[in-house]
């Protein structure tokens, strides 16, 4: 007789004996070095205490938001003013439809690993799981930093705006808390010249570095100044959210001409953006 494994078990995703040995005997207890995420440096540095699982899961997870929107959930329950329990119930309605999507696996792995809950999240189990998670979160032992330490996370590299002061990274380093909290340089906003807030971003950067930015070369130098600042705070990575890899070559003079158009708030063509 064939024994059917439950959805989550100690051999989850381990389909061969070799896989089981490699994971359990070698990989399982190794520290995690998370070199890309969208976690909040402030929440980690301050070890934010969460009152509800909705605050952990639904307050800023655009993957969950997209799944809920795809299912037709009203925005009121996604980023709107609905209360946290209502939002969680709507997420519970969505979860069964994410089968074969990583969201389904992530949801149940997190319930099992962080909260010791093996039950599948469905509309029927939603209120019960909501209460169980909240009780554990409100114990004072599952703050933002605690959750990472419990999973043996050794290093966290957050995604950071070049304008960021990195004060929370510095506070974490000074206080000596685990995990190591390092910044990642994400300069997208200074390359997206077609965005309506582009000029205001340039103005903020100019103020921060204490130099006027009126030419393309000035922008390059200003960003280099911020790279140096980030480097001094432990940054060794950059992150670029490019929709595609651009291949149009351009001279420094042409780049400066496009930049001047942006500063004058004139429209730019698709070719100029690329």
Language-model-derived ranges and their functions:
Residues 2-274:
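Metal-cofactor-binding active-site regions of metalloenzymes
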